Amino acid sequence: SLISLQKQNSILTGEHDGISWLPDVAFRVGEFGRLEFTHQEQDYYMQWMPPSLINMQSSPEYLLAQMEYAGVDRAVLQHDRVYGHLDDFLGECIKKYPNKLVGLAQVQEWRAGEPEQLDRLKYQVLEQGFRGVYFSTGGFFHVDFNMGVNDSSLDSFWSLVEELNIPVHWYAGEYRNPMMEIYLRELEDFDIWAKSHQNITSVLTHGLNNISMLRGQPDSVRYQLPEVMVRLLKNENWSIELMLHLMASDTPYPPYNSNLDKLVEDLINEIGIEKLMWGSDMPCCERTLSYKQSLVLYKEKCEFLTQDQRDLITGGNLEKLYPL
């Protein structure tokens, strides 16, 4: 029988960080949102997606039905490698529903400056209709984290991104210990990059991941804006995706966590309302709450918000990046 496995369980931890120390645990994708592993003849699972994702598939029609129920007009599809190389599938989705779905291109981040990946990006944008690119530093796992976003091998990639005039959606996704120290160092790297690439529009996805990393800490420590994050987001052309319901997913009902209201207010005061963008992480969000409920914090709570400000957070600001 399968036994539930927590994400930080030592079974999944190699001797060091990177693909060279990847443990052999017979990894496989299961059903009902589960990832499965075997260790010492015992099978384990991790609940990665909600159980409602029976066969780990989400058709565009399924997403559109969810959007209609939640009152969402358009969606941005963040194309992380962990979902697979979905260039053709997502390309078909956005061509079929161009007024509903915006696609982000994908590259192998550690090889992004190589001709093959440059051609791949050009094809996704110019032929398949992708309008931005998703870039996760988790990709550096494939080279044992021996490079970063400011590596000179990526210069040709950034030049192409600027030439194509597309936004970058960033994920500080190394996710290795010491967790907070690495996360803050990644934000520092992004800030260095931002100052050298001021013509490229950027969105920091999975905003305020520090909240998730600091579980168990006092609220006064956990629900703080890191100084480096504020500094990064003050760069021109930088915005942040607010996914606060997942960062505080251990609380009973995140939209009613008053610490999150305070963070939204602090962000407005520090960087301005025009840089804030709601993100759901659908279908992942349904491990915590429904797609519709992921909007509650911005549509119903945060009493200091005007209606115009609510509209900007829940689509208006993103609409400026990807107008119809």
Language-model segments: which ranges?
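Alpha-helical scaffolding within the catalytic cores
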Residues: S58-L63, H85-G91, P115-L121, E186-D191, ...
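Active-site gating/metal-coordination segments in enzymes
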Residues: D73-R74, Q78-R185
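Short aromatic-enriched loop/helix-cap "lid" or pocket-rim segments at secondary-structure transitions
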Residues: L2-N9, D88-F89, Q117, F145-M147, ...
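Short, glycine/acidic-enriched loop or turn micro-motifs at the edges of active sites
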Residues: L2, E109, E174, N209, ...
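Catalytic pocket-lining loop regions of alpha/beta-barrel enzymes
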Residues: R131-G132, F140, M147-M277
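Mid-to-C-terminal alpha-helical segments outside catalytic/metal-binding sites
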Residues: L2-Y69, D73-R74, E265-D266, E270-M277, ...
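Conserved, mostly hydrophobic/aromatic
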Residues: M67, L90, V161, I240, ...
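Active-site metal-binding loops of divalent metal-dependent hydrolases
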Residues: S1, D80, G207, S280-M282
